[in-house]
Structure formats: structure tokens, C-alpha cells
């Protein structure tokens, strides 16, 4: 069985946000409860021998136990679980790296065993991995992936879809929004604004700049945009 779904791409492109919210859509469609189990990076432990393996095994044990209770003899589960591993390269980095610490290597083995246990039992669990560094993921984890999705920076239509409603509410017209879409496309290097650049930086900056009693003006928005830079391109390192 092929278990994990892997989402990769630059920071700020929505990988984690989608993973944390997709369960709501599934729950509504299937009329079941869906629970998110985020795997904390604390499972890497402090480096003591056997600690990472023990923590990862405990995380999978807890997930397996909860998922077993959701199985029904009718075949349709009473609920589902999303087992989310954000920054997955920190937990599943390639064992082909000659400089990899023994404890990290053992942790990858424990992770693979945990994924295989869930898959073999055909439990209602979706394992979702998010990473900025696809080449850093262990080949055995990649082979097990049911799907690998590439997340990139939003295009013109996508950026407009993100900013149109809030900017319209602030009094911007269509021509104003077109100009902001153009200015967030990036320069000659083609590095445009990410989703989080728009939602967590640009829009809040416009509001805070006008606080407490000034209107948000198009001319001022352009001034801010000329200073506000998009998240730099993520340069993915190759494993040793």
C-alpha cells in the first residue's frame, strides 16, 4: 500500500495551511469527524541514543490506536485522521547522506516502519508530509508516496483571487487591483509574492499603516509595495 501524500515547494505557498484545513472539507463531504494529528519536531528529541526512535514509535502507536477505534465492519470508517508531518525533511532526511548522525538514521527507519504499519492495517489515516526540500527526503519515503504535489508561487489569477475581496472592501477599484497584481508578480528574476506574503505581510501592513483612523489609499499601497519584498527564492541543497 502507498500511504503518504507529499507536498513540496517554497516557503509560504500554502502547504501547511492546506494540510491543516483539508480535513474540514473531507469531514463535511463524508459526514464524519476528521482529527488532525500534527507531528511535533520535538519528536527528534535531544540526540540521546534511541530517543528519536522511541518518540516516533510512540506517535505512530497513538495514531494507530485512535484509528483502530474508527474502523467499522461495514467498511466505512466512523471517522478519519490526518497525520501531518510539517518540515518533513527534518524527520525523514535521506539516509544516503554520508554525514547523517546514527540517531537520525534510526529515526528515519522508525518513521518508515510506522508508515508501513498504518498502510498494512488499511486504517483511515492520511499521512501528509510537507517540505521545502524534496531532494532531502529519503528515497524509501519517496517510493512510498501515493502522490507528490508541487506547490509554487501564485500566478496573476491566483494572486488576484487572494487580494480582490479584501482590497475591494477597502475601497480599491478593479484598476487598482490590477496594478497591485502586476507589482506582486516579481521583477526580472521572476520571484513574485507567495500566498503568505500577500495574506500575512502585504494586507496586514496596509491596515497597520492606516491605523487607527486613516483610510487605506491606493497611492500609499503602491509606496509600501515598492519597499516590501517577496520571500526570496528557496535554494534547495542536494544531499551529500
What is the meaning of each model-derived region?
Residues 156-240:
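C-terminal alpha-helical "lid" subdomain
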Residues 1-178:
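Walker A/P-loop NTP-binding motif of AAA+ ATPase domains
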Amino acid at each position: 500500500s502507498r500511504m503518504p501524500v507529499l507536498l513540496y515547494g517554497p516557503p509560504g505557498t500554502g502547504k501547511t495551511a492546506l494540510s491543516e484545513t483539508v480535513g474540514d472539507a473531507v469531514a463535511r463531504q463524508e459526514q464524519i469527524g476528521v482529527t488532525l494529528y500534527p507531528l511535533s519536531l520535538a519528536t527528534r528529541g535531544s540526540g540521546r541514543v534511541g530517543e528519536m526512535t522511541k518518540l516516533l514509535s510512540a506517535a505512530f502507536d497513538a495514531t494507530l490506536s485512535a484509528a483502530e477505534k474508527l474502523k467499522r465492519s461495514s467498511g466505512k470508517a466512523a471517522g478519519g485522521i490526518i497525520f501531518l508531518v510539517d518540515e518533513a525533511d527534518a524527520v525523514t532526511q535521506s539516509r544516503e547522506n554520508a554525514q547523517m548522525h546514527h540517531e537520525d538514521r534510526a529515526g528515519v527507519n522508525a518513521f518508515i516502519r510506522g508508515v508501513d504499519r498504518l498502510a498494512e492495517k488499511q486504517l483511515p489515516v492520511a499521512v501528509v508530509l510537507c517540505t521545502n526540500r524534496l531532494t532531502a527526503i529519503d528515497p524509501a519515503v519517496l517510493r512510498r508516496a501515493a502522490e507528490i504535489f508541487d506547490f509554487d508561487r501564485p500566478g496573476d489569477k491566483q494572486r488576484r483571487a487572494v487580494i480582490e475581496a479584501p482590497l475591494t472592501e477597502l475601497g480599491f477599484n478593479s484598476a487598482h487591483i490590477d496594478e497591485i497584481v502586476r507589482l506582486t508578480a516579481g521583477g526580472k528574476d521572476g520571484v513574485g509574492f507567495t500566498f503568505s506574503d500577500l495574506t500575512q505581510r502585504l494586507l496586514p501592513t496596509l491596515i497597520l499603516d492606516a491605523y487607527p483612523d486613516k483610510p487605506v489609499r491606493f497611492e500609499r499601497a503602491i509606496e509600501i509595495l515598492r519597499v516590501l519584498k517577496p520571500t526570496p527564492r528557496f535554494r534547495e541543497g542536494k544531499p551529500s
